[in-house]
Amino acid sequence: MLFDRFAQDCAHARTSLAAKDIHGKAKAIDHAMCIVIELKAALDHAAAPELCANLEAVYDFVLARLSDANAKLTVPPLDQATKLMAELGDAFRQGHAL
């Protein structure tokens, strides 16, 4: 699932930051951002306008956190993005199980 891969990318970015591997960090964050952009692009505003608007705001926040982590070389924004996307992934899994 995309949410799991997002978490893997953020974990790799954290490891890369600790190792001062700027290229590895950038590659991992770039891939995580691509996942969020694809999720955002898949929103069907005609089918569920309010839900999609809320998810779009969450995705924009996550993208901003990833950008901060990438630019400032810090882990806390990665942790915020990871936590939020994990919660969304859990919600999607629960909804799918119904």
Give the location of each predicted region:
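N-terminal first-folded block
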Residues: 1-24
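Heptad-repeat amphipathic alpha-helical coiled-coil interaction surface used
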Residues: 6-7, 13-14, 40, 63, ...
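Solenoid-repeat scaffolds in large eukaryotic assemblies
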Residues: 25, 32, 78-81
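Amphipathic, heptad-repeat alpha-helical segments
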Residues: 29, 36-37
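Short, solvent-exposed, charged loop/turn and helix-capping segments
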Residues: 38-53
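Amphipathic, charged alpha-helical scaffolds that flank and support histidine-based chemistry
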Residues: 48, 66-82
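Long, amphipathic, charge-rich alpha-helical segments that form helical bundles/coiled-coils
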Residues: 52-66
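Amphipathic, coiled-coil-like alpha-helical segments
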Residues: 78-98
